[in-house]
Amino acid sequence: MAKWGEGDPRWIVEERADATNVNNWHWTERDASNWSTDKLKTLFLAVQVQNEEGKCEVTEVSKLDGEASINNRKGKLIFFYEWSVKLNWTGTSKSGVQYKGHVEIPNLSDENSVDEVEISVSLAKDEPDTNLVALMKEEGVKLLREAMGIYISTLKTEFTQGMILPTMNGESVDPVGQPALKTEERKAKPAPSKTQARPVGVKIPTCKITLKETFLTSPEELYRVFTTQELVQAFTHAPATLEADRGGKFHMVDGNVSGEFTDLVPEKHIVMKWRFKSWPEGHFATITLTFIDKNGETELCMEGRGIPAPEEERTRQGWQRYYFEGIKQTFGYGARLF
């Protein structure tokens, strides 16, 4: 997918008589099985919980069967992973008595969300009953799901590098349908005075846009996509920096998009000052993202206020394509593959 503010890499193929797979535009596949094995073992073996009854920890990954891969089809990433896992855990009571048990995870796959993955916790044969089983089933299972979520997120970021490359020579060009201003017009725009305070931006004609989109994931997961640096880099296919706190800054898409978070309520809404670098200096729009739970799906409502009037359609199309479709293509949150 082309970056916001750049040309589409697919067209480089037209310049070659041999139709070489430039920028991996045609079908490519990357095997992530070995990496996944190491990553899952590291994450699972870090699981440890404790309460007034004692503590429990995963001590061994006794079985890890499966595979993982990433496919790039015409610039769109498709993730596949399927694992059957067995773990051994040890519990130690406050009195120092040790207990051993097992965990089975038969269906860690791309067909199930993390919350849908089955996790079975049990004591080893001939072990006496202990309240530590309840600790492992409740708090231990929560940490196991967190570990699986981290695995899935990192799989979708670390292995995308190089599968969709930037435009030729790394040069940024204006999007189609957005002609650059003539030199005379750019010169005619006076630069804002550095001594003049601009708390609310420059005065220009503005407009409001609203968009709605449904994602096949939970509000919690979709919120993470917008507030986790690695996930933002994954769906934009470009470097990004962000601090997901009130007052935290963000820079995305090689600096083409920047702003500041002004309010964040996990799983509920995000409010931010947002600008595209071609906008008049000092001007920010206010973007509000509202996450609505729709029985396992999420309806995302985007409202943008203060959009420069000449940029209305470009901004609308940019959010639809580079945010919404980009997220669906990268993480599989769409009803269909784009």
From Swiss-Prot:
<dbReference type="InterPro" id="IPR023393">
    <property type="entry name" value="START-like_dom_sf"/>
</dbReference>
<keyword id="KW-0143">Chaperone</keyword>
<feature type="modified residue" description="N6-acetyllysine">
    <location>
        <position position="212"/>
    </location>
</feature>
<dbReference type="GO" id="GO:0006457">
    <property type="term" value="P:protein folding"/>
</dbReference>
<dbReference type="GO" id="GO:0044183">
    <property type="term" value="F:protein folding chaperone"/>
</dbReference>
<feature type="cross-link" description="Glycyl lysine isopeptide (Lys-Gly) (interchain with G-Cter in SUMO2)">
    <location>
        <position position="203"/>
    </location>
</feature>
<feature type="modified residue" description="Phosphoserine">
    <location>
        <position position="258"/>
    </location>
</feature>
<dbReference type="GO" id="GO:0051879">
    <property type="term" value="F:Hsp90 protein binding"/>
</dbReference>
<dbReference type="GO" id="GO:0005829">
    <property type="term" value="C:cytosol"/>
</dbReference>
<keyword id="KW-1017">Isopeptide bond</keyword>
<dbReference type="InterPro" id="IPR013538">
    <property type="entry name" value="ASHA1/2-like_C"/>
</dbReference>
<keyword id="KW-0832">Ubl conjugation</keyword>
<keyword id="KW-0256">Endoplasmic reticulum</keyword>
<keyword id="KW-0945">Host-virus interaction</keyword>
<dbReference type="GO" id="GO:0032781">
    <property type="term" value="P:positive regulation of ATP-dependent activity"/>
</dbReference>
<comment type="function">
    <text>Acts as a co-chaperone of HSP90AA1. Activates the ATPase activity of HSP90AA1 leading to increase in its chaperone activity. Competes with the inhibitory co-chaperone FNIP1 for binding to HSP90AA1, thereby providing a reciprocal regulatory mechanism for chaperoning of client proteins. Competes with the inhibitory co-chaperone TSC1 for binding to HSP90AA1, thereby providing a reciprocal regulatory mechanism for chaperoning of client proteins.</text>
</comment>
<dbReference type="GO" id="GO:0051087">
    <property type="term" value="F:protein-folding chaperone binding"/>
</dbReference>
<dbReference type="GO" id="GO:0051082">
    <property type="term" value="F:unfolded protein binding"/>
</dbReference>
<feature type="cross-link" description="Glycyl lysine isopeptide (Lys-Gly) (interchain with G-Cter in SUMO1)">
    <location>
        <position position="182"/>
    </location>
</feature>
<keyword id="KW-0963">Cytoplasm</keyword>
<dbReference type="GO" id="GO:0001671">
    <property type="term" value="F:ATPase activator activity"/>
</dbReference>
<comment type="subunit">
    <text>Interacts with HSPCA/HSP90. Interacts (phosphorylated on Tyr-223) with HSP90AA1; the interaction activates HSP90AA1 ATPase activity. Interacts with HSP90AB1. Interacts with GCH1. Interacts with SRPK1. Interacts with FLCN.</text>
</comment>
<dbReference type="InterPro" id="IPR036338">
    <property type="entry name" value="Aha1"/>
</dbReference>
<feature type="modified residue" description="N6-acetyllysine">
    <location>
        <position position="3"/>
    </location>
</feature>
<protein>
    <recommendedName>
        <fullName>Activator of 90 kDa heat shock protein ATPase homolog 1</fullName>
    </recommendedName>
</protein>
<dbReference type="Pfam" id="PF08327">
    <property type="entry name" value="AHSA1"/>
</dbReference>
<dbReference type="GO" id="GO:0005783">
    <property type="term" value="C:endoplasmic reticulum"/>
</dbReference>
<keyword id="KW-0007">Acetylation</keyword>
<keyword id="KW-0597">Phosphoprotein</keyword>
<dbReference type="InterPro" id="IPR015310">
    <property type="entry name" value="AHSA1-like_N"/>
</dbReference>
<dbReference type="Pfam" id="PF09229">
    <property type="entry name" value="Aha1_N"/>
</dbReference>
<dbReference type="GO" id="GO:0045296">
    <property type="term" value="F:cadherin binding"/>
</dbReference>
<dbReference type="GO" id="GO:0036506">
    <property type="term" value="P:maintenance of unfolded protein"/>
</dbReference>
<keyword id="KW-0346">Stress response</keyword>
<comment type="subunit">
    <text>(Microbial infection) Interacts with vesicular stomatitis virus glycoprotein (VSV G) (via cytoplasmic tail).</text>
</comment>
<feature type="modified residue" description="Phosphotyrosine; by ABL">
    <location>
        <position position="223"/>
    </location>
</feature>
<dbReference type="GO" id="GO:0070062">
    <property type="term" value="C:extracellular exosome"/>
</dbReference>
<comment type="similarity">
    <text>Belongs to the AHA1 family.</text>
</comment>
<feature type="modified residue" description="Phosphoserine">
    <location>
        <position position="193"/>
    </location>
</feature>
